């Protein structure tokens, strides 16, 4: 989805970035006193989590059943795209994501796969990635999981955004990663995430 020349229009209203690091996490009820499996909760909410919504792409709807099931068996990511978002746990078509920590440091190590959109200031459009890099003008640090969870260290900003296509397609905001020097468009709001233990939140 391309929004050429649209980004600059909305850069009039800029938001202040929130930076935070998730290190030395503690979740005593899972895998030892420090390291474990976590959910990411949005600060200031009761039950809003980071997760993903899925939808069937237009190309999948126009092909034969045989081709569809073949692509599904091959686990083709483009068949049923999963978009990174935030929502309450009981939201339809939404699944909270979990992330694991590195045993030696207890720092975030990996997250389940989902597409994450970002504003690309090089091409002036909204682009997508699958946990690889932030944008073409970024420092190209691999491992978007750590970029997202340790935004101060990697000089990135985390925000929820509501471009028109997201509201119409998924009825939920996207979660975007911005470079440190980028101004946030007026349709974006910075957020802070906190790690929570799944069992403490009622997840089994």
Curated annotation (Swiss-Prot):
One Gene Ontology cellular component annotation held by this UniProt entry: cytosol
InterPro entries on file: Vel1-like
Domain of life (superkingdom): Eukaryota
Compartment(s): Cytoplasm, Cytosol
Cleavable signal peptide: 1-17
Protein keywords: Cytoplasm, Signal, Zinc
Protein name as it appears in the record: VEL1-related protein AC977.05c
Originating organism: Schizosaccharomyces pombe (strain 972 / ATCC 24843)
């Amino acid at each position: 989805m391309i929004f050429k020349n649209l980004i600059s229009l909305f850069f009039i209203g800029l938001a202040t970035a929130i930076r935070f690091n998730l290190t030395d996490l503690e979740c005593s009820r899972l895998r030892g006193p420090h390291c474990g499996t976590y959910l990411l909760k949005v600060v200031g909410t009761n039950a809003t989590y980071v997760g993903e919504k899925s939808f069937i792409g237009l190309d999948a709807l126009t092909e034969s059943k045989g081709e569809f099931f073949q692509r599904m068996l091959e686990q083709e990511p483009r068949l049923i795209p999963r978009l990174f978002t935030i929502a309450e746990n009981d939201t339809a078509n939404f699944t909270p994501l979990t992330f694991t920590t590195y045993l030696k440091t207890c720092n975030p190590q990996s997250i389940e796969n989902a597409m994450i959109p970002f504003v690309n200031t090089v091409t002036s459009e909204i682009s997508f990635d699958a946990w690889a890099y932030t944008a073409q003008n970024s420092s190209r640090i691999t491992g978007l999981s750590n970029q997202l969870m340790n935004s101060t260290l990697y000089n990135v900003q985390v925000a929820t955004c509501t471009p028109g296509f997201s509201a119409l397609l998924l009825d939920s905001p996207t979660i975007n990663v911005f470079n440190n020097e980028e101004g946030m468009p007026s349709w974006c709001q910075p957020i802070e995430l906190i790690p929570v233990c799944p069992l403490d939140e009622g997840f089994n």
